[in-house]
Amino acid sequence: MARTTPIARYRNIGISAHIDAGKTTTTERILFYTGVNHKIGEVHDGAATMDWMEQEQERGITITSAATTAFWSGMAKQYEPHRVNIIDTPGHVDFTIEVERSMRVLDGAVMVYCAVGGVQPQSETVWRQANKYKVPRIAFVNKMDRMGANFLKVVGQIKSRLGANPVPLQLAIGAEEGFTGVVDLVKMKAINWNDADQGVTFEYEDIPADMQDLADEWHQNLIESAAEASEELMEKYLGGEELTEEEIKKALRQRVLNNEIILVTCGSAFKNKGVQAMLDAVVDYLPSPVDVPAINGILDDGKDTPAERHASDDEPFAALAFKIATDPFVGNLTFFRVYSGVVNSGDTVLNPVKSARERFGRIVQMHANKREEIKEVRAGDIAAAIGLKDVTTGDTLCDPDNVIILERMEFPEPVISIAVEPKTKADQEKMGLALGRLAKEDPSFRVWTDEESNQTIIAGMGELHLDIIVDRMKREFNVEANVGKPQVAYREAIRAKVTDIEGKHAKQSGGRGQYGHVVIDMYPLEPGSNPKGYEFINDIKGGVIPGEYIPAVDKGIQEQLKAGPLAGYPVVDLGVRLHFGSFHDVDSSELAFKLAASIAFKDGFKKAKPVLLEPIMKVEVETPEENTGDVIGDLSRRRGMLRGQESNVTGVVIHAEVPLSEMFGYATQLRSLTKGRASYSMEFLKYDDAPNNVAQAVIEARGK
């Protein structure tokens, strides 16, 4: 089967935004204008197509990044059809993982900002993730029809708060109630969309006389930005020659692809204005799969030889599974992005991460939660496979004869855990199944059984994250659960170096004995310097401990790291140097050396100034001005460190660093302090030493 759309006409994009910037409505309008959706779904009444999980419709926030395919031929039908694959990304901070994983498979992104609220704290988190994956992006300033809307103010914030280089592609004509359309700064024409057909048709008109000077000024700014793309254009521009529309667009595209500028458009998705021109900007300025660098990976040759795959049907098949979802009708759906090659339904592919073969039974392309079955997918496509057996988010799927392991995604460690138990004993097994499935979908969510209490523990990125997991168990798997009090994921570490710590395990009374003897140094590592948080150096000279026992020493220490001597929390940032010891020809064994190492570790840890580490959260609170004092006072009582504040149209944004243990129930407290007018977001920042009184209380509570 031949390719229907050339790969250069593909656009794999994400639509990313702060909560309430109107991202879902914007996506809905895109689906409407691209002809997929005949009736526009409004988030206000819970009917939007992209928000397909029930909780999202209730909470009015987008949780799961659904992938949707649409076609666009331009507002004035000026292009060949372009295939736009849209990945919807959530804006809530507890779902940062969803944003992260979608950024990994995008080629470009549209950042949606609210014309009133501007660049919010959450927008900065998303921006950092887009920077990390070097995603070219454009911005859409939405809600121009709202009270207090100000397009150029938001352009200024993109520069000051995100450190970006924004270049307006349009200007808003009017604002609030008087918002009627936009000025196209490339064509230097006003665009007015027709209300009667929900903005499907439009007219080019002259720029309003009272905006001519402003339009000239920003047109000049746009031309200068374009001219900076090459010396040739700069000479032409400085020589007083006019740049053609084609030259301007080509130059701006090049600068967007190089991540040098952010083109900014505006509109009101709700009022059917501006989304159509933003779609044109997606086609004109965002990359196709062939415009972005080839994807990197390593060969499965035992040497980790670097390799890459280019976006071409002729290269061997390679894809990345970026999301696992459970569908009530077909079971497991594995969303994947094809980077190279072609795969047909019925083909067998390899998952090199698990060394397992998988058969692609049915392949579907998703439109929000409706699906269309297809026979093949090619380089650049995003699709979902039904019924793959053992694939986790971040796994590679590739041609078994040309094995490559694509770069893995990085997932954050959970910072909060709670115990859960089913309301009825009969549901125990069902709960285990449900949690196992949900953990497969979401790598930032973990499940395990506490060995001492035998309770099931679930852990995630925040209270909302775990609330939604419990909620999904009830809705999707019919399992009602009771939940315990949230627990903080503390860590243990040392702050001093200790040397010549001895560990000896000797039992030599009759029969075959046991003998292991080690001497180690222990020292703290710089936090984050070692991805494993642990290093082991073997400095044994002259065979005082035979080589075959060295791994047992390492293993003996690693087993102790799982539950530290202070309060039973994992030990991090620790280095160990093994430099002396002794053995017995007959009585020594791996087990004896493992035990000797654990004795030395426990002794050394106590002497090396052990500390309890607690997770510190970056907290940002947006509050009306009159409540600022109360909010700051409350954060200080929670051991918060103030890191600054700034005013905006809607009030004051307070930046603070607060221990997670002090943030439980914060949403309720903030609501009562500000009569429900404040909002906050928090994300994990770092681990830091817990003060003595806090550490003492935690240690006593653990009964250590």
Curated annotation (Swiss-Prot):
SMART domains: EFG_C, EFG_IV. One of its GO terms (molecular function) is guanosine tetraphosphate binding. Residues 8-290 form the tr-type G domain. InterPro entries: EFG_II, EFG_III, EFG_III/V, EFG_IV, EFG_V, EFG_V-like, EFTu-like_2, G_TR_CS. It is found in: Cytoplasm. GTP binds at residues 17-24, 88-92, 142-145. Disulfide bonds: none annotated. One of its GO terms (biological process) is ribosome disassembly. Keywords: Cytoplasm, Elongation factor, GTP-binding, Nucleotide-binding, Protein biosynthesis. It comes from the Bacteria. One of its GO terms (cellular component) is cytoplasm. Catalyzes the GTP-dependent ribosomal translocation step during translation elongation. During this step, the ribosome changes from the pre-translocational (PRE) to the post-translocational (POST) state as the newly formed A-site-bound peptidyl-tRNA and P-site-bound deacylated tRNA move to the P and E sites, respectively. Catalyzes the coordinated movement of the two tRNA molecules, the mRNA and conformational changes in the ribosome. Belongs to the TRAFAC class translation factor GTPase superfamily. Classic translation factor GTPase family. EF-G/EF-2 subfamily. This is Elongation factor G.
